[in-house]
Regions:
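Flexible, solvent-exposed coil segments and beta strand-coil junctions
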Residues: 1-6, 63, 122-129, 206-219, ...
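Conserved small-residue
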Residues: 10-16, 20, 27-136, 256, ...
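Extracytoplasmic gating/loop element in the C-terminal half of outer-membrane beta-barrel translocons
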Residues: 164-256
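Membrane-embedded beta-strands that build the outer-membrane beta-barrel scaffold
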Residues: 20-28, 36-44, 144-150, 155-163, ...
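Flexible, surface-exposed loop regions and adjacent strand-edge segments
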Residues: 1-4, 53-63, 174-183, 265
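Transmembrane beta-barrel architecture of outer-membrane proteins
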Residues: 3-6, 16-20, 42-48, 139-144, ...
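Flexible loop/turn segments at secondary-structure boundaries
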Residues: 45-49, 158, 165-169, 259-262
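Surface-exposed coil/turn segments at beta-strand junctions on protein surfaces, enriched
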Residues: 15, 29-31, 150, 228, ...
């Protein structure tokens, strides 16, 4: 049979998932006017890619985030791929000590002071795509949830907590901070920029009046996505059958997303 098309899409590759989920409930107090109970769950899951004929990448996130999510046999979906940063060039001696700039002109070497130093992973004396490595995993080690219910007579208070642990997040918002003249700079990035006086504590490269600079997709943009959240608070009062033809009357209120504790910016 012939379709007339020059190419044909086909499915290949597979993903294996293995996991475990545990649930439990504890009745901590059970009195006439007072009850207190907890129920929770925790889930573990691991996935693994297989059956690919070569490495490939998930769709580009946006113009400045290409080839961030690596798909490779033996790795999980959501693996982050990029360069590894190795501090900053603090002085001309550090620039010259790097084989990449050992023969650079004086002007080029001076321009590199205060710039990000990337790890030459394969030690070939230059920074290329071959120096990229796995820099994160968006899959959590585990996710969990906890309900706590406290009742006093007709009044019931319910709390629901949830969270994850061990998952990384690629913070694409940070890729817009180029420390150059083409875009805005956040106050935090500006205050923590490289300067000769702040070299030891710098988190961002020096500012420049140039339109652009070479800032590679690196572990700079990977953050710990673990979080602990009080998702909901429910308060309920049961009036019982205080009105004829109404067997039960309750009034309740709910607050959502009360607070979140996380290191993600």
């Amino acid at each position: 049979n012939s379709t007339g098309y020059t190419t044909m899409w086909t499915n290949f590759g597979h993903v294996k998932n293995k996991g475990l989920e545990l649930t439990g409930k504890i009745i901590a107090l059970d009195k006439k006017d007072w009850t207190l109970d907890f129920d929770g769950n925790i889930s573990f899951n691991k996935n693994e890619i297989g059956g690919l004929t070569a490495d490939q990448y998930a769709n580009q996130l946006w113009y400045s985030a290409k080839e961030v999510f690596l798909q490779r046999n033996g790795l999980p979906i959501g693996t982050l791929f990029g360069y590894i940063e190795d501090g900053f060039y603090d002085n001309i001696a550090e620039v010259r000590a790097d084989p990449i700039y050992a023969k650079a002109s004086d002007d080029e070497a001076r321009r590199m002071i205060g710039e990000i130093k990337y790890l030459d992973k394969n030690n070939d004396g230059k920074i290329t795509s071959e120096d990229r490595a796995i820099i994160g995993d968006t899959n959590p080690d585990f996710i969990y949830g906890l309900n706590a219910n406290l009742r006093w007579k007709n009044l019931t208070l319910g709390l629901f907590f949830q969270g994850t642990h061990g998952n990384d997040i690629f913070n694409g918002n940070l890729t817009n901070i180029g420390m150059s003249s083409i875009a805005n700079i956040t106050q935090d990035a500006y205050d923590s920029r490289w300067t000769p006086e702040n070299a030891a504590n710098a988190k961002w490269p020096r500012v420049t009046t140039a339109m652009t600079r070479d800032m590679k997709l690196s572990d700079r943009y990977v953050e710990d996505g673990s979080y602990f959240r009080l998702k909901t608070i429910n308060l309920n009062y049961n009036f019982g059958s205080v009105i004829k033809r109404i067997s039960n009357l309750s009034v309740f209120g709910t607050v959502t997303n009360v607070f979140t504790i996380t290191g993600y910016s």
